[in-house]
Amino acid sequence: MLDVDKIRKDFPMIENNPDLVYLDSAATSLKPQCVIDAVVDFYARHTSNVHRGDYRVAEINDKLYDGTRNLVAELIHCDKDEVVYTHNVSHSLNQIAFGLKPMLKKGDTVLITYAEHASNVLPWFALQKEIGINIEYIETDNEANITIDTFKKAMHEGVKVVSVAEVTNVLGSIQPVKEMCEIAHSYGAYMIVDGAQSVPHMKVDVKDLDVDFLGFSAHKMCGPYGVGILYGKKKLLDAMEPVF
């Protein structure tokens, strides 16, 4: 049986605010003591750059850094060389959008929905202004659900990118990403998934879904701020222009 009191004791924020009922984890999760300890331990015991030093403390961090990449690869079922560290999912989505910029041209269409987080909207607005891409919207129902029929209606030969949240951050609607990937790829379009809300709560297998890119944040799944993940198919990461 789930021991709620025991779990609450793992979180100093709750211990220090005993009357708190926290319902804002979709925005950011609370941090357990073990995560706080790990961050403090880095600054107190083994501070160094990664892959820049040839001494004991640096070697500790190299192993932690690379080991975490392996754990992320296991979590989402991909190769470790397909895992890129970012600051958060917003940074991941910006890196993807601007990394694809050389592959897009004026008149190309990006499909999103009206239910997207600003992180999955503003980069496309920027590219619309810079290079003249078109932004079109997939129709959803009143609960922000995409149906396969409405997605098929939205797709056309001019669509080069489809970018949607697997789970919406407001209503929690779960989109049929696997089926959408198959349809998008049949048109030659890239499929980008905002996994900020799905990866913390669902099994996400990027190979099974066949997504081209996926982003998510550590801070929404009991991790620290300033850590995000960008997954991309290796051949696509190799083909993209680095964004500095």
Identify the residue ranges that each predicted region occupies.
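Pyridoxal 5′-phosphate
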Residues: 1-244
